[in-house]
């Protein structure tokens, strides 16, 4: 039986879930070094100043709009890290995935000055991943759900959009510009 080229292997989705969660944990770790400077009232963009710009914040929401005290921001970061660990281990991955998406979007909206395209890409992967069955392999499950799935491939629109997202990101690979940019970034050229 021929497989459709848009079908995703469920084992690779499980590994994708783990890798995305590890990326989130590394991101949380590095953001925590500058937590006070970037996300609190003692930093360069206090919440009251940011909210006073309605042309920027009128359509945005953020969990970090609840307050900007260092204690509250630290608690929110710890909750975010807890959901990322849950996503990595596969403990209620759908809930953890959506909560990680909400927290990352909240960070993005709280201080857009430090956001980059990697944040947008991670948001998109989390969004599409939450519609995929990425908990079928390599996930902590209850005793009643220990049997391995019979089918190891999954085909859906969310999977197709995930594949297209990766394809569009790496569309410059055949042009040869990716290698040039990498060598330039490494200082070889």
Language-model features, listed with the residues they occupy:
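Alpha-helical membrane-anchoring segments
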Residues: 1-189
């Amino acid at each position: 039986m021929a497989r459709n080229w848009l079908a995703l292997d469920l084992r690779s989705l499980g590994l994708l879930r783990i890798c995305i969660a590890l990326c989130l944990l590394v991101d949380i770790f590095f953001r925590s070094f500058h937590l006070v400077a970037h996300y609190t009232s003692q930093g360069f963009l206090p919440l009251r100043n940011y909210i006073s710009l309605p042309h920027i914040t009128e359509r945005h929401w953020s969990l970090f709009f609840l307050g900007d005290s260092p204690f509250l921001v630290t608690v929110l970061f710890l909750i975010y890290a807890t959901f990322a660990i849950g996503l990595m281990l596969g403990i209620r991955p759908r809930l953890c995935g959506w909560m990680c998406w909400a927290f990352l979007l909240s960070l993005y909206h709280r201080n857009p000055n430090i956001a980059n395209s990697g944040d947008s890409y991670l948001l998109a992967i989390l969004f599409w991943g939450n519609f995929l069955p990425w908990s079928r392999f390599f996930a902590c499950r209850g005793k009643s759900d220990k049997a391995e799935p019979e089918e190891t491939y999954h085909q859906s629109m969310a999977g197709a959009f995930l594949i297209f997202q990766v394809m569009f990101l790496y569309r410059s690979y055949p042009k040869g510009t990716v290698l040039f940019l990498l060598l330039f970034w490494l200082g070889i050229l």
